[in-house]
Amino acid sequence: MMRIGLFLLTNLAVLVVAGIILSLFGVGSYHGAGGLNLGNLLVICFVFGMVGSLVSLFMSKWMAKKTTGTELIDPNAPRNQAESWLLQTVAELSQRAGINMPEVGIFPSYQSNAFATGWNKNDALVAVSSGLLERMNKDELRAVLAHEIGHVANGDMVTLALIQGVVNAFVMFFARVVGDFIDRNVFGRQDNEAPGMGYFIITMVLDIVFGILASAIVMWFSRYREYRADEAGARLAGKQAMISALLRLQAETELPDQMPKEMKAFAIAEGKEQGFSLAALFQTHPTIEQRVAALHQLDCP
């Protein structure tokens, strides 16, 4: 599952745009002669925050195809045995998981990887890299596909969108509360004065800063959902196959990460980061060692 990219980057961009619109056209609805109307502000921020998150959710599948170069497999005309096997395996796993058959695709990447995305568990996309097809045996590949189907069946994208929407709302709310405080106490705005340019600049900057800091909450959920998807993969394809697939992926963690930054949240594996690396609090995936240890504790064949 590629680290928190496509969804979060799109969401952050929409959040900033929503914040600008809110600051320019919605100030009068929560700014009065006596200062901030916190009740109105919270409601407005909740609406704007959820809109940003839902836009990201509905765009996720389209963005995934564009950023990774995923080529969909025609379910009625697979071009070779590998494509035919992928379609059959995904169809079987989807049926067992109780979801509709997702779109299936292949994206060009030497790194072994895969992802699942989509706004609805019955309208999803599962894609694997060309490198994954070349280097994994069928049992391991089936486990990876089961892991991705697990993400879809668990409704991880919808849950992520709801969490991100709430986070967005509080980011926008506190950015404006802090911005108003600074505008009054640093720039000297009086109660009877409208917010000035300093207020708008401060809230825009705080939207970005608070958005990055608050992403730690979303990162925590991303790590949690990996354990759940691993469990789903183990139950659908076998625990040993899931462990074997993860250990094979571990050997590639020293390779440079070839996934677009926008898609890292949804990949099954992360390559080695180039340059500065954020603290574990901002990691979207548990380590392979942690994931394998959790699988060993799982009570399933």
Curated annotation (Swiss-Prot):
User: Which cofactors are required for activity?
Assistant: Zn(2+)
Uppermost EC category: hydrolase
- Describe cofactor binding as the record notes it: Binds 1 zinc ion per subunit.
Q: Which UniProt keywords apply?
A: Cell inner membrane, Cell membrane, Hydrolase, Membrane, Metal-binding, Metalloprotease, Protease, Stress response, Transmembrane, Transmembrane helix, Zinc
Q: Where does Zn(2+) bind?
A: H147, H151, E226
Q: Can you cite an annotated GO cellular component?
A: plasma membrane
Q: Which InterPro entries match?
A: HtpX_protease (IPR050083), Pept_M48_protease_HtpX (IPR022919), Peptidase_M48 (IPR001915)
Query: Which residues are annotated as active site?
Result: E148
Compartments, as annotated in UniProt: Cell inner membrane
Keyword check for Disulfide bond, yes or no: no
| GO BP annotations listed | proteolysis
Membrane topology type, per the record? Answer: Multi-pass membrane protein
Recorded superkingdom: Bacteria
The protein's Enzyme Commission number: 3.4.24.-
Q: Which GO terms describe its molecular function?
A: metalloendopeptidase activity; zinc ion binding
Main location group: membrane
- Mark the transmembrane ranges: 4-24, 38-58, 155-175, 200-220
The UniProt entry's sequence similarity note says: Belongs to the peptidase M48B family.
NCBIfam families, alphabetically? Answer: PRK05457.1 (NF003965)
PANTHER family the UniProt entry points to: PROTEASE HTPX (PTHR43221:SF1)
- Can you say what this protein is called? Protease HtpX
* UniProt organism field: Acinetobacter baumannii (strain ATCC 17978 / DSM 105126 / CIP 53.77 / LMG 1025 / NCDC KC755 / 5377)
What's the gene?
htpX
